[in-house]
């Protein structure tokens, strides 16, 4: 585990910010497999900056994020710590080893958050193109509803399948393609993840754990640019997005 010194007391604008949004810790889930990339996706450079560094920089610059806890594989801890130093990620307080499953990793991160945290924002380390606006809107809604996450509408026709054949259509107006950060009250998501583990569930996102408890998650507007970099094609698309942003 790598531990960083906490930054100096928040300036006035930070104290003013906390009057309208609660203390929020971002947990960056920076583990997982990179088999589809042939190399570690987190350290692939997009326009000269590693994917994980770009992700951290967005949360570092957000005025609604107070702390960053990074959960990663043991062999990546030192490398990520070096990147935090290189890119001045001063909000990063801890880098911890993740678990065998995503739920275990998120729980490991929750165990390290500040006692002041009233919200926890769980974000995929491989989503470097999330924007400050998405983070802020989702934090504010989670502060009111206890759970919130960004989504985008499903555009393709979706079918159920059985034995290799179509078995009926699914109304895409009732579907949402979920993104991160997914933001919750710490006690809510911790209880939900522990219950999901006890129930033997295998989940691909954290909202599913909360839904398993019978609770609802408020949906905020995501972005088609908030992609998860998992394939070589994603790298090309991400670089195109960065180029377009630089030309605006």
Residue ranges and their predicted role:
Residues 101-165, 179:
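Conserved beta-loop-beta/alpha segment of the NTase-like Rossmann-fold superfamily
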Residues 2-5, 176-248:
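Conserved alpha/beta core of the MobA/IspD/sugar-nucleotide pyrophosphorylase nucleotidyltransferase superfamily
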Residues 168-178:
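A recurrent flexible, glycine/aromatic-enriched loop bordering the glycosyltransferase active site
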Residues 78-83:
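Acidic helix N-cap motif at the loop->helix transition within catalytic regions
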Residues 17-77:
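N-terminal glycine-rich phosphate-binding loop and ensuing alpha1 helix
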Residues 88-100:
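Conserved donor nucleotide-binding strand/loop of the catalytic core
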């Amino acid at each position: 585990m790598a531990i960083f010194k906490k930054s100096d007391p928040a300036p006035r604008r930070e104290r003013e910010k906390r009057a309208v949004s609660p203390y929020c810790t971002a947990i960056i889930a920076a583990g997982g497999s990179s088999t589809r990339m042939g190399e570690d996706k987190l350290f692939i450079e997009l326009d000269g900056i590693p994917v994980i560094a770009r992700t951290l920089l967005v949360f570092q610059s957000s005025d609604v994020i107070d702390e960053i806890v990074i959960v990663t594989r043991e062999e990546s801890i030192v490398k990520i710590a070096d990147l935090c130093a290189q890119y001045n990620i001063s909000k990063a307080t801890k880098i911890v080893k993740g678990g065998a499953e995503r739920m275990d990793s998120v729980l490991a991160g929750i165990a390290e958050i500040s006692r002041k945290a009233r919200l926890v924002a769980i974000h995929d380390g491989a989503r470097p193109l999330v924007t400050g606006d998405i983070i802020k809107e989702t934090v504010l809604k989670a502060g009111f509803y206890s759970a919130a996450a960004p989504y985008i509408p499903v555009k393709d026709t979706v079918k159920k399948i059985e034995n290799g054949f179509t078995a009926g259509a699914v109304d895409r107006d009732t579907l949402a393609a979920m993104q991160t950060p997914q933001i919750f009250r710490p006690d809510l998501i911790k209880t939900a993840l522990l219950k999901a583990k006890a129930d033997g569930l295998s989940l691909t996102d954290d909202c599913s754990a909360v839904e398993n408890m019978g609770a609802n998650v408020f949906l905020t507007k995501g972005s088609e640019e908030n992609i998860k970099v998992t394939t070589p094609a994603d790298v090309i698309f991400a670089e195109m997005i960065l180029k377009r942003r630089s030309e605006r």
